[in-house]
Design a protein with these regions (language model features):
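Conserved class I S-adenosyl-L-methionine
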Residues: 1-34, 42-46, 65-68, 72, ...
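Helix-to-beta-strand junctions that scaffold the AdoMet/dcAdoMet cofactor pocket
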Residues: 109-110, 123-125
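Class I SAM-dependent methyltransferase SAM/SAH-binding core
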Residues: 32-36, 40-90, 114
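A short SAM/SAH-binding and catalytic strip from SAM-dependent methyltransferases
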Residues: 98-112, 135
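A short acidic, Gly/Pro-enriched loop at the edge of an enzyme's catalytic core
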Residues: 90-100
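Core SAM-dependent methyltransferase catalytic element
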Residues: 256-268
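C-terminal helical/coil "lid" or tail adjacent to the Rossmann-like core of SAM-dependent
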Residues: 2-3, 186-246
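Conserved catalytic/acceptor-binding region of the Class I
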Residues: 113, 126-198
Length: 268
């Protein structure tokens, strides 16, 4: 279950990729903007401030996240939709879409390469599609998670839940996919050298980060509190060795993959 408060503990670090992604979207005055995987709505509300005249739609599968989003949206600036992006129908909006944003979602959606062409088709000519996904599934934060899961008595249940890295392609794959369906494409990758917990307030800052994302599938399987505590303790200990605290905080490198595409005029 998604926990908005846990996820937002590192809001500044999580916001930066969104800002880098959307800075490359050149839409001037879009009429319809969709945020796929809007989460707690923090970034979606930024879109409403950037394009105040647009109809903004935030789509997410987590009722908990959408509840938080609605509470934050005191001005009713956004239409919040509870839906799975795999079954979400762009035609339900009744008009072509000008901008589709997907920030840090598609790693959870293994089928996204076959969904992207449909989203591009739903764009108005000249419309924009922008996506960002983590590319750090071979980093210690993830390899150690799989190692601890493999040693668990419930490895058979845990390991199948930890295959998100297989859903994420290398940057060139997204370039060829989007260029092949009639888009002008900008694809890049960045490794952020993140400094977590500079004030040394957390026992394990990388563990706190993963509790908001990567660790969630494990916690979904391990319902027993003792099982959870044992797993988290073993994983946390391994993380402290892989990411030792420095005098200025804990360095947590994080690779991310970006793709921004503009649908060429004259294509529908």
């Amino acid at each position: 279950m998604w926990n908005p408060e846990q996820y937002e503990k590192f809001s500044d670090h999580r916001r930066r990729p969104f800002a880098d992604l959307t800075s490359r979207v050149g839409a001037g005055s879009p009429e319809i903007v969709v945020d796929l995987g809007c989460g707690s709505g923090t970034h979606t509300l930024e879109l409403s401030r950037r394009w105040p005249r647009a109809r903004i739609i935030g789509v997410d599968l987590s009722a908990e996240m959408l509840d938080q989003a609605r509470r934050s949206d005191s001005g009713d600036l956004v239409e919040w939709v509870l839906a799975d992006v795999e079954s979400w129908d762009p035609a339900s909006l009744g008009a072509p879409i000008d901008v589709i944003i997907s920030n840090s979602l598609l790693q959870w959606v293994p089928s996204h390469p076959r969904l992207i062409p449909g989203w591009i088709a739903a764009l108005a000519p000249g419309g924009w599609f922008a996506m960002q996904v983590p590319g750090n599934f071979n980093a210690p934060s993830h390899t150690l998670l799989r190692d601890v899961a493999a040693k668990s008595p419930r490895a058979g249940e845990l390991l199948p839940c930890l295959g998100r890295g297989e859903a994420v392609s290398e940057p060139a794959v997204y370039l060829f996919l989007l260029a092949g369906i009639g888009c002008d494409v900008d694809v890049w990758e960045t490794t952020y050298q993140q400094i977590l917990d500079p004030d040394a307030l957390q026992d394990g800052p990388v563990l706190e980060w993963t509790k908001g994302t990567a660790l969630l599938p494990v916690l979904g399987v391990l319902k027993d509190e003792c099982e959870r505590a044992d797993f988290v303790a073993a994983y946390g200990k391994a993380l402290l060795q892989a990411y030792p605290r420095q005098p200025f905080g804990t360095v947590f490198p994080f690779r991310r993959i970006f793709a921004v595409a503009q649908k060429k005029e004259g294509r529908d």
